[in-house]
Amino acid sequence: MEFDRMLIRYGELSTKGKNRKQFVTKLAQNVKRAMTDLPEVRIHGERDRMYIILNGADYQLAEERLKPIFGIQSFSPAVRVNLDLEEVKAAALALVQDAHEENGTFKVAARRSHREFPLDSNEINQEIGAHVLQNIEDLTVNVKNPDVKLTIDVRKEGVFLSCRTILGAAGLPVGSSGRAMLMLSGGIDSPVAGYLAQKRGVEIEAVHFHSPPYTSEQAKQKAIDLAAKLAKYSGQVQMHIVPFTEIQEVIKQQIPESVIMTVTRRMMLRITDELRRKRNGLAIVNGESLGQVASQTLESMLAINAVTATPIIRPVVSMDKNEIIQIAQKIDTYNLSVQPFEDCCTIFTPPSPKTKPKLDKIEHYESFTDFDALIAKALDNIETISVNVAETVQVKDEFADLF
């Protein structure tokens, strides 16, 4: 069966009252970005549902693109026919014939919002159900648990028919809750944190710290590939790759070994916060899970967070490693994350890092080095790329005026 549209049902958008239009607009933008390589597709957002007019595009590809987009409760491949009973009968029969299996069951569920249509909902159920039964011999009715549920929606603009309902990703449209910077390493935790933030409507821009020659191009590519996995949920993720070699080398030379990790994280957070300010972000997201490593004790978090007053969102803070791994496997980032390429969080790691660093001592150690100049230099040399769900494209000079 050739479907001509996708019918999208909203998730939590149904509870958003006066802000509903804003949420629908944001969802439409995300769907459009996810369909960038399907230029023939047209998107029409309405108060209670959204239609994607395929115009000949591959509906199966469109279906795959819709599944991970947050803000969609469910969707159905559908066909539209005119407000003509015979056309409805023909389309209904074709849909059920295509969907049913031998000795299967079905039901018709009609809804008529267009009152000028000559039959009411019950009459449509009876008329279409009888027509289908007369033309498919091995089919019976089961109104409680049918193998095939034919939905018919009679509206002023036409009659819409579908036989499948596919669960969406639910949540809120990415971007509806504002923008945040995701500190994206090559590990397991930060992509999961990015996924969970997006599910609550946060638009993420990834920040990755790259320290060649200590970290390889493969490590950089792994981070880009992880960002591409996250782009599925919004259509696109902006990624900022920060040159971090010089800062790490200075830290290694000037800072006591036991607090190298703490100072490194503080510099990362300062750079991320400056990017957030320039990009009009509202928060920073990271993959910290309380107590997993030395830098993730409450004392370490306190010392690291002291460089900023910006809200830090930690979606996985209370999860154990197995819980995080389960989500990573679900969103298809786990196999990428465990590839054995070093990132800058693992180089120069001391054998016995302090788990309870003192903020006053950390600030004292830092005071002997002009980290402000090093941070400004790193910001001036950031590489920004746009990671798209369909392809990865390097962005040249797109944010030149910001740095």
Curated annotation (Swiss-Prot):
CDD domains: PPase_ThiI, THUMP_ThiI
Principal place of residence: cytoplasm
Gene3D superfamilies in the cross-refs: 3.30.2130.30, HUPs
GO biological process: thiamine biosynthetic process; thiamine diphosphate biosynthetic process; thiazole biosynthetic process; tRNA 4-thiouridine biosynthesis
The protein's annotated pathway: Cofactor biosynthesis; thiamine diphosphate biosynthesis
Listed GO CC annotations: cytosol
Residue stretches making up the THUMP domain: 60-165
Record function comment: Catalyzes the ATP-dependent transfer of a sulfur to tRNA to produce 4-thiouridine in position 8 of tRNAs, which functions as a near-UV photosensor. Also catalyzes the transfer of sulfur to the sulfur carrier protein ThiS, forming ThiS-thiocarboxylate. This is a step in the synthesis of thiazole, in the thiamine biosynthesis pathway. The sulfur is donated as persulfide by IscS.
Similarity comment text for this entry: Belongs to the ThiI family.
Protein name: Probable tRNA sulfurtransferase
Gene (UniProt): thiI
